[in-house]
From Swiss-Prot:
GO MF term (any one): ubiquitin-like ligase-substrate adaptor activity
GO-annotated biological processes: distal tubule morphogenesis; monoatomic ion homeostasis; protein K48-linked ubiquitination; protein ubiquitination; renal sodium ion absorption; ubiquitin-dependent protein catabolic process
Functional note: Substrate-specific adapter of a BCR (BTB-CUL3-RBX1) E3 ubiquitin ligase complex that acts as a regulator of ion transport in the distal nephron. The BCR(KLHL3) complex acts by mediating ubiquitination and degradation of WNK1 and WNK4, two activators of Na-Cl cotransporter SLC12A3/NCC in distal convoluted tubule cells of kidney, thereby regulating NaCl reabsorption. The BCR(KLHL3) complex also mediates ubiquitination and degradation of WNK3.
InterPro entries registered for this protein in UniProt: BACK (IPR011705), BTB-kelch_protein (IPR017096), BTB/POZ_dom (IPR000210), Kelch-typ_b-propeller (IPR015915), Kelch_1 (IPR006652), KLHL3_BACK (IPR030578), SKP1/BTB/POZ_sf (IPR011333)
Family named by the database record: Belongs to the KLHL3 family.
Keywords linked to the UniProt accession: Actin-binding, Cytoplasm, Cytoskeleton, Kelch repeat, Phosphoprotein, Repeat, Ubl conjugation pathway
Protein name as catalogued: Kelch-like protein 3
Domain BACK: 152-254
Quaternary organization: Homodimer. Component of the BCR(KLHL3) E3 ubiquitin ligase complex, at least composed of CUL3 and KLHL3 and RBX1. Interacts with CLDN8.
Functional pathway: Protein modification; protein ubiquitination
Alphabetized Pfam families for the sequence: BACK, BTB, Kelch_1
GO cellular component: Cul3-RING ubiquitin ligase complex; cytoskeleton; cytosol
SMART domains: BACK, BTB, Kelch
Organism expressing this protein natively: Pongo abelii
């Protein structure tokens, strides 16, 4: 503040052999430069001692040459060189709009500038022109923080045009790491042929299956089919068809009209079919770009724990960082929600149905991890709490549950592409407090409570989306309602749960290949209504209750050692009936 005294720092220097007369003190006033620039800016605002006028469009800005030259190499070269501008009183700056130039000259005097979504694309090139490299870097940092599947390709193109090398690399890596979501957006569909080829040929492309790459090619061609059809073979050259399952090749790729009508594409399909006929040792001898597995850069993951009872329905959402063993609070749910189904799909976390403390609901909220915000989408057809939720073939399934008066056998599915819910075949048994999981293209509904027999269930049903039918598979060894169900290495785990008043710590695992259940090691604690997720080959069971209190602890199972281990750090809140999902950690 004006008139405020500033503490000076000083240093006394004494040379060896000198007497006291040769002592000297250097005094540093850290506020001096700031005060000086503040006064210069006040002089500028009063148009005092100004010796140059900078003009852009219809905006005229009075300034001091020495200040501009001190902060901008562009102005320094202009004012100290042999150009006519070195003596001119009025200088026009082209290729910069007046408002942006005014902001940048304000920055020269104040060291303050606001970068926003609205101004960053004009601010960065203007800062580059004036060689205000700190502002340019701030713009790059801002764009990097805004990377999202819907804009990363646009930011990549912008970075390329303006030679922002680091931002270009970051945006490209982001596009590769989030390809399944990126391919759904308008930016991807608007790419040029060479840009699509460059992206889908990358070894670093992060896809759970080569199916996504094939689907992306078909979508891009169909977007402007008339002009793009001729590029089909060039694109399919970069799809690693031999790495696709044989069933998918026969049922989907071979049936695609764009493949049927192109001889080169049919050759790629034949190559893939022949690859599947070879013994494994001979497959390894085939070396071409289409048989080489992709090697994506693994993104660190975080675990999201959504809502729950503590002891009433809550809005709180916690995020666990596996690398740092730390829990953080993130954006709360728009309203209280427990007993919901929670899944990760297409780059977002979905919280489906549940109980808000007074009513069973059919509403759905979606979390965007990049923006750290929740939004609402289309509601389900029925109210459901204690439902099961899972993702299969890009559809979100809401299975069973309780509508406030009765247990439900009905099942509905949601397409994020159309934002619509529709019913599929109901289960054979009403199931509330049901656990669900997806293994090898089938959806399983495990245990629960049917409300009619007043018994917890040991039965398990399997849904086949190809036939839209539910069938019973092998029963569990024990009745389990509120079991935590998860999938690890192609097997279905049922953890804890309860049978009447008895809360279990036992765990059993289902092998679809043999249609059998077997016991594995017990958990450290009895748990029902816990959240479950699989990360990096481990199965995590989160919270729940033990029959008397809600639990804040988390434990994980290692199938190699057949042991459960408690996480060293608990959640901030004990919660049961919370949903769990795993997402990529934001860059």
């Amino acid at each position: 503040m004006e008139g405020e005294s500033v503490k000076l720092s000083s240093q006394t220097l004494i040379q060896a052999g000198d007497d006291e007369k040769n002592q000297r003190t250097i005094t540093v006033n850290p506020a001096h430069m700031g005060k000086a620039f503040k006064v210069m800016n006040e002089l500028r605002s009063k148009q005092l001692l100004c010796d140059v006028m900078i003009v852009a469009e219809d905006v005229e800005i009075e300034a001091h040459r020495v200040v501009l030259a001190a902060c901008s190499p562009y102005f320094c070269a202009m004012f100290t060189g042999d150009m006519s501008e070195s003596k001119a009183k009025k200088i026009e700056i082209k290729d910069v709009d007046g408002q942006t130039l005014s902001k940048l000259i304000d920055y020269v005097y104040t060291a303050e500038i606001e970068v926003t979504e609205e101004n960053v694309q004009v601010l960065l090139p203007a800062a580059s022109l004036l060689q205000l490299m700190d502002v340019r870097q701030n713009c790059c940092d801002f764009l990097q923080s805004q990377l999202h599947p819907t804009n990363c390709l646009g930011i990549r193109a912008f970075a390329d045009v303006h030679t922002c090398t680091d931002l270009l690399q970051q945006a490209n890596a982001y596009a590769e790491q989030h390809f399944p979501e990126v391919m759904l957006g308008e930016e991807f569909l608007s790419l040029s042929l060479d840009q699509v080829c460059s992206l889908i040929s990358s070894d670093k492309l992060t896809v759970s299956s080569e199916e996504k790459v094939f689907e992306a090619v078909i979508s891009w061609i169909n977007y402007e089919k008339g002009t793009r059809l001729e590029h089909m073979a060039k694109l399919m050259e970069h799809v690693r068809l031999p790495l696709l399952p044989r069933d998918y090749l026969v049922q989907t790729v071979e049936e695609e009209a764009l493949i049927k009508n192109n001889n080169t594409c049919k050759d790629f399909l034949i190559e893939a079919m022949k690859y599947h006929l070879l013994p494994l040792d001979q497959r390894l001898l085939i070396k071409n770009p289409r048989t080489k597995p992709r090697t994506p850069v693994s993104l660190p993951k975080v675990m999201i724990v959504v809502g729950g009872q503590a002891p009433k329905a809550i809005r709180s959402v916690e995020c666990y960082d596996f690398e740092e063993d730390r829990w953080d609070q993130i954006a709360e749910l728009p309203s209280r929600r427990c007993r919901a189904g929670v899944v990760f799909m297409a780059g977002h976390v979905y919280a489906v149905g549940g109980f808000n403390g007074s009513l069973r609901v059919r509403t759905v909220d979606v979390y965007d991890g990049v923006k750290d915000q929740w939004t609402s989408i289309a509601s389900m057809q029925e109210r459901r709490s204690t439902l099961g939720a899972a993702v299969l073939n890009d559809l979100l399934y809401a299975v069973g549950g309780f509508d406030g008066s009765t247990g439900l056998a009905s099942v509905e599915a949601y397409s994020y592409k159309t934002n619509e819910w529709f019913f599929v075949a109901p289960m054979n048994t009403r199931r509330s407090s049901v656990g669900v999981g997806v293994v090898e293209g089938k959806l399983y509904a495990v245990g629960g409570y049917d409300g009619a027999s007043r018994q917890c269930l040991s039965t398990v049903e399997q849904y086949n989306p190809a036939t839209n039918e539910w069938i019973y598979v092998a029963d569990m060894s024990t009745r389990r309602s509120g079991a935590g169900v998860g999938v690890l290495s192609g097997q279905l785990y049922a953890t804890g749960g309860h049978d009447g008043p008895l809360v279990r710590k036992s765990v059993e695992v289902y092998d679809p290949g043999t249609n059998t259940w077997k016991q594995v090691a017990d958990m450290n604690m009895c748990r029902r209504n816990a959240g479950v997720c699989a990360v990096n080959g481990l199965l995590y069971v989160v919270g729940g209750d033990d029959g008397s209190c809600n639990l804040a602890s988390v434990e994980y199972y290692n199938p190699v050692t057949d042991k459960w281990t408690l996480l060293p750090t608990n959640m901030s809140t004990g919660r049961s009936y919370a949903g769990v999902a795993v997402i990529h950690k934001s860059l």
